[in-house]
């Protein structure tokens, strides 16, 4: 698993990151920055929709010396002029906004993005994402933001939103390539929790942005992440799976018998899901 940290003056773990993300500003010491972090990939965040030809020529020249950089472009769902200009110049780029549906996923891959930023339903269907990428372009990197709970309606239960607990990072190995954190001022903290400690003691709403529900993280067992990576959000499709809710119930203080009963329910649920898939 690779880790991308957003650059700030207060971030002390930049040298440990595989990638460093920084807002792109023309003629603002880009070469010096790349030289300082020459062993890491640089992600240049840009909101512009157009670069003058002189800027493109400069970027092409920089790439000869520092080839491992790419642009994260705010495209609004479509590859606008800037994206096509970068592609034609041989400069890697991807969309900064998370992709959540298959139509947009296929569109972006065919437009030549180097990475694809996932959330929503696609992030619950990573087995199929991996399969399709192997067909369309296996070099594309999958990126996610693990510490942000994304869902359309913030008032719905956060358990239906996509996020990854620090304890579940290993579960996503081979399906996700890069983790990039929300929270500009707390990049050090999240790198420590996810990459070094690989655990968090406390309520999930203390480490996951947008998770507005107090669930004791240490009470969740490993089945939580294992199922979510490929569940396809069956709970929203009238399916039989409600494992997230059952496992969250286990995180609450309860007697041994109550815990056994919930585990029995989960096991029975697993058998129903397996039989429905056969």
Q: What positions do the PLM features span?
A:
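Active-site pocket-lining/capping segments in soluble small-molecule metabolic enzymes
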Residues: 1-278
């Amino acid at each position: 698993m690779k880790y991308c940290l957003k650059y700030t003056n207060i971030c002390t773990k930049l040298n440990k990151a595989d990638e460093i993300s920084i807002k792109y500003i023309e003629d603002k010491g880009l070469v010096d920055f790349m030289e300082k972090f020459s062993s890491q990939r640089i992600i240049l965040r840009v909101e512009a929709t157009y670069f003058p030809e002189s800027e493109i020529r400069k970027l092409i020249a920089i790439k000869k010396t520092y080839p491992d950089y790419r642009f994260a472009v705010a495209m609004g769902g479509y590859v606008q002029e800037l994206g096509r200009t970068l592609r034609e110049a041989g400069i890697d780029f991807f969309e900064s906004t998370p992709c959540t549906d298959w139509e947009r996923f296929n569109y972006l891959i065919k437009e030549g993005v180097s990475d694809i930023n996932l959330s929503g339903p696609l992030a619950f269907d990573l087995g199929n994402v991996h399969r399709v990428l192997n067909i369309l372009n296996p070099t594309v990197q999958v990126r996610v933001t693990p510490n942000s709970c994304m869902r359309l309606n913030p008032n719905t239960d956060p358990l239906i939103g996509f996020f990854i607990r620090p304890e579940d990072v290993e579960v996503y190995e081979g399906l996700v390539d890069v983790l990039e954190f929300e929270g500009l001022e707390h990049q050090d903290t999240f790198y420590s929790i996810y990459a070094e400690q690989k655990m968090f003691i406390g309520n999930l709403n203390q480490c996951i942005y947008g998770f507005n529900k107090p669930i004791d993280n240490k009470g969740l067992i490993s089945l939580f992440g294992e199922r979510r990576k490929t569940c396809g959000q069956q709970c929203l499709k009238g399916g039989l799976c409600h494992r997230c809710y059952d496992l969250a119930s286990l995180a609450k203080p309860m007697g041994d018998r109550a815990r056994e009963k919930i585990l029995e329910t989960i096991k029975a649920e697993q058998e129903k899901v397996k039989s429905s898939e056969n």
